[in-house]
């Protein structure tokens, strides 16, 4: 659905509540959908293992399988976040809808509270309840040191522990990853609504062996 079109007070490109008197007919309405084109690509990890190693080490097969699954998961995350399109997936950092917000008075990769507020303010209202922060791992200390002084002489820290070992910022979850660009480069801190990112998986991950 074209859920971001609210022109004329309607939703989904044309649905709007009408108030009618008893017995009066309701006007016919039509919503609008958006076309999404998905291009299939194949992701592969090829590993050459000698039969001696596979036979002599009892747990090697299971260990290799776990390693491959972890590498595939990390590879998919990398594609969906930083993929450049073409032969790769088109990641969120390189999507046409990405909006870059410059920091205010930022230097040496410092994060300013004004920067965080600008990013949250540019998020579409419908996405503010679903969005998450993605942050470079090296931003952890910098984000923990962002604070807002109050008139009473106290300070407020926008990033807080969520009680489950994670963090939230302005009420939204913060996920740290090493996939994002280095601190100080564009994309080291991202606010994204993943409900607007489409992924089509034609089949589940399979592990195949050949002698």
What do these predicted ranges mean?
Residues 183-192, 196-211:
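Short, intrinsically disordered, charge-balanced linker/junction segments flanking boundaries
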Residues 1-130, 150-156, 161-169, 173-175, ...:
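Acidic/polar, low-complexity extended loops/arms that serve as protein-protein interfaces
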Residues 140-149:
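Short active-site loop/helix that positions an aromatic residue
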């Amino acid at each position: 659905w074209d859920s971001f079109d609210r022109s004329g007070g309607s939703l989904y490109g044309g649905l709007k509540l009408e108030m009618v008197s008893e017995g009066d007919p309701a006007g016919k309405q039509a919503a609008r959908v958006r076309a999404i084109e998905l291009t299939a690509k194949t992701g592969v990890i090829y590993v050459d293992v000698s039969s001696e190693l596979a036979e002599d080490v009892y747990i090697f097969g299971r260990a290799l399988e776990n390693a491959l699954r972890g590498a595939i998961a990390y590879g998919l995350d990398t594609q969906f976040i930083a993929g450049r399109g073409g032969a790769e997936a088109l990641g969120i950092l390189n999507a046409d809808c990405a909006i870059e917000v410059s920091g205010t008075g930022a230097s040496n990769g410092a994060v300013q509270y004004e920067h965080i507020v600008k990013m949250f303010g540019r998020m579409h209202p419908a996405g503010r309840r679903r969005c998450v922060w993605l942050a470079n791992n090296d931003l952890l200390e910098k984000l923990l040191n962002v604070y807002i002084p109050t008139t009473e002489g106290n300070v407020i820290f926008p990033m807080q522990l969520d009680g489950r070992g994670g963090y939230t910022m302005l009420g939204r979850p913060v996920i740290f990853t090493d996939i994002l660009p280095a601190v100080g480069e564009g994309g080291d801190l991202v606010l994204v609504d993943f409900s607007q990112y489409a992924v089509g998986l034609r089949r589940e991950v399979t592990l195949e062996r050949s002698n």
